[in-house]
Amino acid sequence: MYEIRIHGRGGQGAVLAGGILATALVLEGKYVVAVPSFGFERRGAPVASLLRFDEREIRQMTNIYHPDCVLCIDPTVARAVNVFEGVKDGAVLVQTTAKTLGELQLPPQVATVGLCDAVSIALDIFKRSITNTIMLGAFARTTGLVSLESLQAAIQKSDFRDAGLTQNMAALARGYEATQVHRIERAQAA
């Protein structure tokens, strides 16, 4: 089973991103459980969307405490919550940031990092900082766990309040293309 925790802020589409990713994985024949994790947060407050998938039926309906992957659709959310809490060894981080890998502080459990300056792309496409579909493209590029084609099909099934289908398809593709993937080699303890 593979577990993903998506971090963002209220109003950025973290929950919608989880739903789109779940649909794309189902289209690829996976079993998926998606759990939005939010209460009465206001726009801008930290939110999370939780998703697990597998090749076989999933009976586990709990929160995700030890994710394989952390997808951050907001560059500042790590200042408000510990996005790395409980990550497994060999974890994947997919982060929206204009920073380089060397500028990030990563825990030793993180082995793969996908970086995408999604805010700049969002400002170009949407004229505001809505990064969810861009970061789904970044997730696909970084992990290889879902195809761009399945994400495109899932986006076509979605209902977007703030932007049109054409813009979101362009955002997905740009996120995929703009993502830099880094594998981190950690020295083995003696």
What are these regions (language model features)?
Residues 1-190:
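Active-site cofactor/cluster-binding pocket
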